[in-house]
């Protein structure tokens, strides 16, 4: 209709007068820094509190603060969000009969973070505290340029649980690449895919929920088991990040290191048996059809930042790699 046509004309005129640029005021801000990128299993901003998760609170309030960040429903469970986080490409079904991540395993991916950092002389490492070849992740991440370790592929954790501990993964991996940087000057880009926040969200089906049950029940005494168990298993991510931050600070390299973190997807398993426990967690009354359901937190933090930078521009997981 006439109104929409006029709107298109206005947009065309506006964009036509813009001068494209590959730079902005923050270009080069983190040049030469190490990068740790984390895809956090079923993470949600409603986990974060100053009292219960002080490390997550610090990372989300003292770096870049993204007020309109989203991790959409890519309809691919974990691997869809992970693909978006690690490539900046929209994950799709039906790419020559395959999903995007499956197709990508056999094509060149030169713009991945790992290959880009390798070209600068960085080590590019990836870790996952679950079975190494789930989703074909071994082929996918190695094709992106990572030296990849996971359960049954070089990563040994003291406990064998479901889900495994994010803290134990950090304890098993962090010291080696920090030491290599401090002693030999080898920069690192490290990628983590966590698992502690995985469903089920109850005391019987989640070892991390059981581990951290007391703290979650004390903080949320009037909440359902589903909400308490979800908070409890995500406390393991908090403890993992606390360990990581302490290690960086002890080595004196927090100022040299950028930490980025995004969910793979919102915790959709909290919608179960006809109950929407995610609404209980959030205090909202939305559904999976609502954009608000996919609003999340993006961490982009470096110890060298003297004050937070607030970003109100809407953005999503496909913006991480280009940024």
What are these regions (language model features)?
Residues 4-7:
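Conserved ABC ATPase "signature" region
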């Amino acid at each position: 209709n006439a109104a929409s046509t006029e709107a298109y004309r206005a947009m065309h005129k506006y964009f036509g007068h813009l001068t494209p640029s590959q730079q902005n005021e923050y270009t080069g801000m983190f040049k030469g820094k190490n990068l740790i990128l984390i895809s956090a299993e079923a993470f949600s901003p409603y986990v974060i509190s100053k009292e219960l998760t002080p490390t997550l609170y610090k990372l989300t309030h003292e770096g870049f603060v993204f007020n309109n960040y989203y991790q959409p429903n890519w309809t691919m469970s974990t691997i869809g969000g992970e693909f978006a986080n690690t490539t900046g490409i929209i994950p799709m079904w039906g790419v020559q009969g395959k999903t995007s991540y499956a197709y990508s395993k056999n094509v060149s991916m030169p713009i991945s973070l790992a290959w880009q950092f390798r070209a600068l002389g960085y080590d590019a490492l990836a870790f996952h505290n679950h079975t190494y070849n789930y989703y074909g992740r071994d082929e996918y991440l190695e094709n992106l340029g990572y030296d990849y370790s996971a359960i049954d592929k070089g990563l040994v954790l003291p406990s064998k649980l479901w889900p495994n501990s994010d803290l134990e993964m950090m304890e098993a991996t962090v010291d080696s690449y920090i030491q290599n940087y401090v002693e030999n000057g080898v920069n690192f880009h490290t990628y983590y895919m966590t698992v502690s926040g995985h469903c089920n969200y109850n005391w019987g089906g989640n070892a991390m929920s059981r581990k951290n049950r007391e703290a979650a029940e004390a903080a949320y005494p009037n909440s359902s088991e589903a909400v308490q168990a979800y908070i409890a298993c995500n406390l393991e991510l908090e403890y993992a990040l606390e360990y990581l931050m302490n290690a960086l600070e002890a080595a004196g390299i927090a100022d040299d290191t950028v930490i980025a973190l995004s969910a793979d997807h919102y915790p959709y398993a909290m919608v179960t048996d006809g109950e929407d426990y995610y609404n209980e967690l959030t205090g909202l009354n939305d559904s999976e059809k609502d954009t608000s359901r996919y609003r999340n937190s993006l961490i982009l933090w470096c110890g060298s930042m003297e004050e937070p930078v607030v970003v109100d521009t809407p953005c999503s997981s496909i913006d991480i790699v280009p940024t």
